[in-house]
A protein has these predicted regions:
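Nuclease and nuclease-like effector domains acting on nucleic acids or nucleotide cofactors
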Residues: 1-55, 62-179
Length: 180
């Protein structure tokens, strides 16, 4: 692989994670998420575009499946420990790091990998958040709160826009639940 090809692969990986965070932000705005974010995490996502303590995991390893490197559908959000466990058969192993190949959705609750086999990756299923902070925010802000909160709503709404094709609004069911 040439130097330019390696650099392009790095850009593709970063794009996939950025796009997945954008999609997650849109989902949270709708009261959903691929992770059951608490209210502080939802606010952080809306304000910063990501949630500290979470990493974008390429479900189909880029080393073996470079064709999916730039796909947001190939990303799931995991804590650092769960990300390591996904690469190390359910065990957190700092020494091995992220070098083990993955090909599936890692369930952090059961510590099981659900293989994609020869199929392309698909985005983790979105669920209703247990404590949504933004779903229906426009109505509650505009009916009962002052202009300052309306401006904050407008700011958050414009930041939550997701401009490119995604699975938002489509059936994202894949049979794997991030929480029950």
């Amino acid at each position: 692989m040439t130097r330019e090809e390696k650099l392009q692969l790095i850009r593709d990986r970063q794009k996939a994670v950025r796009d997945a965070w954008s999609r997650e932000k849109t989902l949270v705005w709708q009261g959903k998420g691929t992770v059951n974010w608490n209210s502080e995490q939802q606010r952080e996502l809306m304000e910063k575009g990501r949630v500290s303590g979470y990493e974008g995991q390429h479900m189909k390893s880029v080393s073996q499946y470079p064709e999916y490197a730039s796909s947001a559908d190939n990303i799931q959000f995991l804590t650092h420990e769960d990300h390591l466990a996904a690469h190390n058969m359910g065990k957190v192993n700092e020494q091995n790091g992220y070098h083990s190949v993955t090909n599936g959705y890692y369930d952090p609750e059961t510590h099981e990998m659900h293989s994609f086999g020869n199929n392309p990756p698909h985005a983790p299923e979105a669920h209703e958040l247990s404590n949504p902070c933004y779903k229906g925010a426009e109505n509650s802000y505009s009916q009962s709160n002052g202009n300052e909160q309306k401006r904050e709503y407008s700011k958050l709404a414009s930041n939550a826009e997701y401009s490119h094709e995604s699975n938002v609004g489509k059936n994202m069911s894949n049979g794997y639940a991030m929480w029950r």
